[in-house]
Every structure is written in C-alpha cells, then in structure tokens.
Amino acid sequence: MSKRDYYDVLGVSKGASADEIKKAYRGKAKELHPDRNKDNPDAESLFKEVNEAYEVLKDAEKKAAYDRFGHAAFEGGMGGGQRPGGGFGSGDFSSAFSDVFEDLFGDFMGGQRGGGGRRAARGSDLRYNLRVTLEEAFSGLQKTINVPTAVACSSCEGTGAEGGVEPTTCPTCSGMGKVRAQQGFFTVERTCPTCSGLGQIIKNPCKSCRGQGRVEKDRALSVNIPAGVETGTRIRLAGEGEAGMRGGPPGDLYIFVEVAKHELFERDGVNLYCRVPVSMAKAALGGAIEVPTIDGGRGRVQVPAGSQSGRQMRLRSKGMPALRGGGIGDMFIELAVETPVNLTSKQKDLLREFDELSEDNNPETKSFFSSVKSFWDGMKG
C-alpha cells in the first residue's frame, strides 16, 4: 500500500511553519492515541503514521528532502545511495515526539513532568476560615488561630531517617524520582515505584514520623487582619502551610475571611446603611436624632420636616475603611416612619381630629385618589 502524503497525514499545507506542524501533530497524536481509542483497531497504525510524518516534517533537512523527493528520500537512497539527514530509520523513534510528549500525555501520567533530577515534595497549602465581627473588620486586629497541620519531625529534623542517618539515593531511578519504560514505539516516564518519586530511600525510618519527615500537630499562629477586610478577603501566609515531605519546602496558609452580619448596620463595599425608626411626629415636624456609628460613637443628623419612610441622609466618612487605603466610606441613615400602636381613647380622638384637619397636608394621598377617580371614570366611559 502506498504511503499517504505526510502533509495530508498531519492536515497541514506544504508551506506550514514549524509551529503549525507541531500544533497539528499534537492535536492528531492526542486524537489518535491508542489509549483513547481502545475500540478502534486502526488507532495504533494511524498513530504510528502521525508520528512518522512528524519525525520527517519537524526536521528541516528531512523536510527539505521530502519536499524534493517524496517518500523515496527515505527508501534506500535516490540512485546514489546516501540518505539525506540519515533517514527515518537511522535514529531512535521516540525522538519524533520527545519535545511534546509531556504536553500531550501528561494526563495519562498523572500530570507529572520529568527531568532535572529529584525535587523534594512541597507541603500542601492549607485553608483556614476565619469569622470576624463588623467592628473587627472596621478596626483590624491581631488574632491567634490554631491550625491543624503537618510540621517537620523534631526527632529526625525532617529527614525521615532514624538517628540522623542520611537517606540514600534510590538505586532504581538513580535519584531522578522517575523511571522510563518502552511501550511500542515511544518511551513512557513514570513515578519510581521504589521511592514514590522522592529519589531517595530510607533504610531505617524514623519511628516518630514513620519515615515521612513530618508529624501532625496543631500550630498557634498570630495573624494580622487589616482594617477593611470583607467576606471573601483572602490572606496568604507564605510558608505556614504543611511541612514538605522529608525536608521539602512548606506550603502556604490561606486565610479566608467571613464578616458576620450586624444587627444595626448593613454593608455595601465601604459604605454602611442603618435603618432608623422615627415617630410620625418627628417625621412630620422634623428635628435632630442621634444614631450609632461603627466606631462606637454617636452621630447627629437633622430630619427634615415632612420626611417619609425610605428617606436617606448621609454621614460622611462614617463608613468602612478601604482595605488597601483610599479613604473611608460613608454611612447612610434610612428613615422608617413608625405608625403608633396600642393607642388610648384620647390618642385615637386626637388622631381623628388631626385627620379631619389635615386633608390638605397629605399631597401624595390626594394625588393618588385623584388618579384612582380618573381611572374609574375612564373605565365607565
């Protein structure tokens, strides 16, 4: 059977750039990989064809020879005998995709990447949920928290080895933490089964930590909570997470702040809102009222005569501080005109008398019922 054109195999034009060829190869190799096409009997042969095409087209010399002579460039010579670029069969087949292998198949290998020797395992990052009051969020505070975590073992100083004996290099992976295995036409890199990827083995594990180099323990940490935090604020404490395995670097601690609801104030960014009840008389006649402020003080505002429920007044710079500077928000007072209850007979008589005398003092009521009358008249007509 005649071979397909290599450009057609990868789905690129003859003038495609090296990056375009590489991108096309990645897509085809991922699409046709046998592990993803176990029900397709042709997957393996198609996968090999893709790798064969990429082996040629990724190499400038081989590509030039292929562009000039086609497949004949790699089939025993062109009448004179020498293969340009050494020919396809002259090298290790796995080199065809060594530069993109990890990007393509990292998901099959658990996302691990090889090379560079062993790296001590970094400790995990930790999350701590911290609930604070609105007053604490306003002023900021220093707070001590207890965090359950893994700390370096004091018995072995984090090495995991008993009696100060140093770990030895793993003989299976030579300290790389990974081993390679040939699978068909390509090389697969996996975590070393002997040392679990650490590159070292311990002949006499520490009894306190069982060779892990760390133990479980609660840590007391002093945390600075800045003024202006709000629900969702995240504070990072570098190096305060779990200790790494066998001397590896520690992870980080992330504190997620939740600001508790307040019985008097509602918060919207840097502004505060306080709903203040006022009597009918105060709303009608006007006058000064005192309101609480988040700093524990008192604010004084003037209620205009004739105020209705929902009217807002502002106290400037009595809100919350901005987290990263930039001033302080305002406090808004919303009036809630309260209707009196549990009236005495005398109070009821006075209100009836007042109602009879106040027909011209309720413009909204008068306007509403005038509109209602017009609506009903229109329905009749």
UniProtKB/Swiss-Prot annotation:
Zinc finger (CR-type): 140-218
Gene Ontology CC entries for this record: cytoplasm
Cysteines engaged in disulfide bonds, as pairs: none
MF terms (GO), sorted A to Z: ATP binding; heat shock protein binding; unfolded protein binding; zinc ion binding
Binding site for Zn(2+) 2: 170, 173, 192, 195
Binding locations of Zn(2+) 1: 153, 156, 206, 209
CXXCXGXG motif repeat residue intervals: 153-160, 170-177, 192-199, 206-213
Annotated compartments: Cytoplasm
Domain J: from-to ranges: 5-70
Major location category of this protein: cytoplasm
A biological-process GO annotation: response to heat
Swiss-Prot/TrEMBL cofactor(s): Zn(2+)
Entry keyword set: Chaperone, Cytoplasm, DNA replication, Metal-binding, Repeat, Stress response, Zinc, Zinc-finger
SMART domains for this protein: DnaJ (SM00271)
Cofactor: how bound: Binds 2 Zn(2+) ions per monomer.
Subunit organization: Homodimer.
UniProt cross-references to NCBIfam families, sorted A to Z: DnaJ_bact (TIGR02349), PRK10767.1 (NF008035)
Function (record text): Participates actively in the response to hyperosmotic and heat shock by preventing the aggregation of stress-denatured proteins and by disaggregating proteins, also in an autonomous, DnaK-independent fashion. Unfolded proteins bind initially to DnaJ; upon interaction with the DnaJ-bound protein, DnaK hydrolyzes its bound ATP, resulting in the formation of a stable complex. GrpE releases ADP from DnaK; ATP binding to DnaK triggers the release of the substrate protein, thus completing the reaction cycle.
Domain-related comment: The J domain is necessary and sufficient to stimulate DnaK ATPase activity. Zinc center 1 plays an important role in the autonomous, DnaK-independent chaperone activity of DnaJ. Zinc center 2 is essential for interaction with DnaK and for DnaJ activity.
Family as reported in the entry's similarity comment: Belongs to the DnaJ family.
Protein name: Chaperone protein DnaJ
Gene: dnaJ
